[in-house]
Amino acid sequence: MYARLAFRHLALRPARTLLLLGGYGVGVAVMIVLLSIGEALLAQARDEKLVGGGDVTVLPEGIDVEVMKTGGLGGMYFSIDHARFIQLQLLASPRLAADVQAVAPQIDGTLLYLRTAGGSERTVRAAGEIPSATRAVGALPALAAGAWDDDAGDARWARPTPAQLRDDIDHFHLPPDELTAAERASWAEWHYFNVLSADRKRWAFITLLAGGDIPNGRWGGETLVTLREEGKSERRFVAYAPSSAVSLSTTRVDLAVGESRVTLLPDGRYDVHAIARAANGSGDMVTVNVVVSPAPRAYFPGAALGGAIVSGYAVPALRADASGEICASGACERFDAAQAYHDHNWGVWQGVTWEWGAARAGDYTFLYGRVDTPESDRGSLILYLVDSLGFRSLFRPSRIAYEDARTISVNGRSIRVPATARMIDVRGDDTLRVELQVDDAIGTDMRRGNERGGRGAAMAHPYFIQMKGSARLTGRIGGHPISGAGAGFFETYR
């Protein structure tokens, strides 16, 4: 009977009947699609590779979750750069302690190549986790047998001691094999320290450097010390050492250059000892014996560049104190918890110039910089800001607005140098304004070398300008105002 009624209705009103049947079919199709999507979402919500046992999963920017799950080409080699820095300074930092209970880093499905003792090579997929962290976020897998606990490598990654952290970011490097002979000859790597007296009138630049075709070519080391009193001439001291008198490590901070050395103490402080003779041939000596104590969490983990230039830069002690003694020409000055700074540079520096500065500003400390090469446009300028809880924010000012209203003499030539500088940036709701006032400046003709390690024979801007001055910052971060003032050192080229 129902079939007869349906066919009669179709015969009497075929258009309306077909429209109703079509609508019903579309409705069924939509329902099937929605149920399929819901099932997929439920499966993803239960997938431990995505959930990780916690409330939030952090993935690299731009990664497609479906591509990652299916192993597509776009998900083969993704990674989070400086993952340990993100863990220690962001996700597991004291700043978020009230909101983040636990953090667990995980590597899943990484492609590795395994070479057996017999010489054959196989491709394998590997995963990595830190057991204690995975347990803390509730994602510990069921163990059929045995135990799964942190080993020494896990503990060093997740909970490094101050000394371990600095060994990891402040060790030395060997020149890459792909460098040309000329590039290997211009390779240089150094520890740099500066120390400022309590009245901000006297300061020292201290560098221990290894350079050349390390380790099998022609290379050696230098110790360079510059002492300066505001408004007076600088005193430069230098000592050279052959490669046989240089000891460096690709896993540790420690460096020895002749009679000078930088030694990392077990508690993460730096013992700096330097001996050098006056560069003017007078025979005067300088002896540096200071211990540099980095402030907790005030460091920049490092960045490496490739392409037109091969270089790297890390700041293990963005904010630090120095205690000890510097003696020159028979007179000694004692420093007790004096403002100090330490960075580490490596790479090929032929013809390279830079903008750089680091200063305290009240409770804040900032670092800014940019590297420029003759073959490329200007690099990107960044400003890195920390406070007592560690990393605070990263800004990218478009430029440094210098006012070259000072004049200094370099080898008898008058050079115009900055008297003030200004940087401004707005990133979303966050704002920053930094104003620099230069109190003192010295210049070096880079064709003659300097204690910062750069070298260049034919540079458009060959005069390396080192400045000491005051800094003031203002702005807002995360809806809160920030401000501070202090002193620092700045560098540019003219």
Could you describe each region identified by the protein language model?
Residues 146-494:
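Structured soluble/peripheral alpha/beta segments that form catalytic or ligand/cofactor-binding pockets
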Residues 68-71, 115-116, 137-140, 205-208, ...:
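Short, glycine/acidic-enriched capping/hinge loops at junctions between secondary-structure elements
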Residues 20, 25, 29-33, 74-77, ...:
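A short N-terminal beta->alpha junction/helix N-cap motif
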Residues 1-31:
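N-terminal Sec/SRP start-transfer signal
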Residues 22-24, 59-61, 106-108, 129, ...:
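Acidic/polar N-terminal loop/beta-strand segments that form early-domain functional surfaces
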Residues 131-145:
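Diglycine-centered glycine-rich loop/turn motifs
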Residues 32-125, 132-135:
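Hydrophobic, regular-secondary-structure patches
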